[in-house]
Amino acid sequence: MDATIRLEESWKAVLGGEFRHGYMAELKRFLLEEKQQGRQIFPRGVEYFRALDLTPLDRVRVVILGQDPYHGDGQAHGLCFSVRPGVRTPPSLVNIYKELQEDLGIPPARHGFLESWARQGVLLLNSVLTVERGRAASHQGRGWERFTDAVIRAVNEQAQPVVFMLWGSYAQRKAAFVDRSRHLVLTAPHPSPLSAHAGFFGCRHFSKANAFLTSKGLDPIDWRLPEDPPLAVERQMAPNC
């Protein structure tokens, strides 16, 4: 699998060994069989590792964990909670924007494209990196979880302090091993409409993250998003290109 994988160099240095394990060969076999049977997989193959490509290991300042990619047409592009330009903002992200506004006074963006966060050092990582079209959680238990565990371990072992935003019990269990003596671990219910009112609203994770980063001599995250994604980005991200 590693012969055909494009992975950002700092991540390749610490994760290259994962591609030599049998579970990754099994995962590759599964994905190939799914495609051969005519099943559509989201996101595109070149975007499986998009979160790692945009946020090199030595630049990670914040980690936000998701579960698996959006399974609707044109949504997923490799960053958790984020959708392509021109796609309606999903309900969980709408609630994230509401909390941002309450916390930092940032008006909700008119789009759901979070790439500018990733480029600043926010690792927007799903636990499972692929999904079958129209079938939520269809690729769970196929090996991605082991790979993304290795990603989180690599971040945890970095000397630079990092903020982990763990929303919902799934994310909190997955990152339970993070060293809280070095990193800031923020927990809250998931921003889903089903749970946001149980404690996500009012958690103020965004201001807490920036206060922690500043206290460690690190640049805070600019959580404001561009008013509109550049047209060139929209063309590049078109799902059928």
UniProtKB/Swiss-Prot annotation:
Hydrolase as UniProt keyword: yes
Active-site feature positions: 68 (proton acceptor)
Predominant cellular place of this UniProt entry's protein: cytoplasm
Organism domain of life: Bacteria
GO cellular component, one term: cytoplasm
Keywords on record: Cytoplasm, DNA damage, DNA repair, Hydrolase
Transmembrane segments: none
First-tier enzyme category under EC: hydrolase
Family recorded in the similarity comment: Belongs to the uracil-DNA glycosylase (UDG) superfamily. UNG family.
A GO MF label: uracil DNA N-glycosylase activity
Keyword DNA repair attributed: yes
Documented EC number(s): 3.2.2.27
Name under which the protein is recorded: Uracil-DNA glycosylase
Subcellular location per the Swiss-Prot or TrEMBL entry: Cytoplasm
Functional note: Excises uracil residues from the DNA which can arise as a result of misincorporation of dUMP residues by DNA polymerase or due to deamination of cytosine.
Gene Ontology biological process terms in this record: base-excision repair, AP site formation via deaminated base removal
PANTHER family: URACIL-DNA GLYCOSYLASE
Stored HAMAP family: UDG
